[in-house]
Amino acid sequence: MLAPGERIDIWADFSKLKVGTEVSLNSLAFSGAENVGGTNMGGMMSSDNAPELGSAMMLFNVKIERKEKETLRLPNQLAALPLLRPEDAVNATQPRPIELSLKGMKWVINGQPFEMNTALPQETVKLNSIEQWEIVNKLNPGAMMDAKGMAHPIHLHGVHFQVISREVLPELAAGWQTVKDGYVDEGLKDTVMVMPGERVKLLMKFEKYSGLFAYHCHTLEHEDAGMMRNYRVKE
């Protein structure tokens, strides 16, 4: 599962394919990001011509037109990553809660819409500290626009993090099975997909820079409707 705003590097080897061969990169069908009990995007920015959410589709096609010689080789060992240990977090037993929900006509984080130059005390961290954050994509049973649950790709500015765990509500397990094998949670990230009813724990170190940094949903309709906040790194 590749979230809006998320990036991965792919090494593709076409050397054994014949000239004229075509290879497609396809997005497979899934249901785990469906708007629970509602319609696509809750009616926001929707179109009758848009494909169904989770539909299979071809992303792009590659055609082999000629043979070339290439000397690039993958290294025997990739660079080691400076991974953190969950137990080293200052709040290892009580992760910082980040709740995503719909409040009236606004998408909010911890019940708060975006404020340009503000970070609340609960959004303030210490420079060089290691923390766990727990992002919860709350279902909204009585939500307007029939938007009871949507996927949120959450992007943090100024820091890279590790995904250390995912949990999903039992009633959403069937949809979860269609997406769980598609996650690439290894390594360091700055964007993570959080499905409806899902709980995701992140581990990160706030180093090098102090100041105000944004964190937000990378679905632009949600970000523009308020699902964006700041956190502050203090020395």
Where are these predicted regions, by residue range?
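Generic long, charged, amphipathic alpha-helical segments
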Residues: L169-E198
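Short strand-edge motifs at loop-to-beta-strand transitions and within beta-strands
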Residues: E6-I10, D190-V192, E198-M204
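Extended terminal and domain-junction accessory segments
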Residues: M1-E167, K205-L212, H216-E235
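Exposed loop/turn and edge beta-strand positions of beta-sandwich/beta-sheet ligand-binding modules
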Residues: S129, M150, L188, E198-V200
